[in-house]
């Protein structure tokens, strides 16, 4: 439901939306967000790269269908292999101290985000659940011009004059934001808005 609310809000904005996420699970794509408007700064579990980095290739993990013994937490199926050298493949995600991560896909996504940001006249960042332990998302939102809505139940603090902080879970806050936008849209003389 939260993803749907975000998509509805994004579709109503003059320049649309762009997602910047440190999540590697592909949930924005699964929820129907345009993959050309997503930047996954730590990579994606749905893409693979060669473990020995024989090349700079990153490929979709669509053909890897893991069969897992959930009781023993063991992979039953074959490990994925590099289509170029036959060595083991790994998820294209950035781990701590990971000098072998190939960042080409994430760099291209970041370039797409940068291009979009240059075209946006009035930026609004909606940050949901980003914490200070791995502050990549927080730092980006704070560094950008424009206003921000920070939604975080435990770390909602936001710099002065930067925007609004909401000490709440993501779904609850998004429901309240959407309800407020709908109320504004229903007022006499309100600008035409999408629903």
Label the predicted regions:
Residues 1-195:
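Conserved catalytic alpha/beta core of Sir2/sirtuin-type deacylases, generalized to analogous enzyme cores
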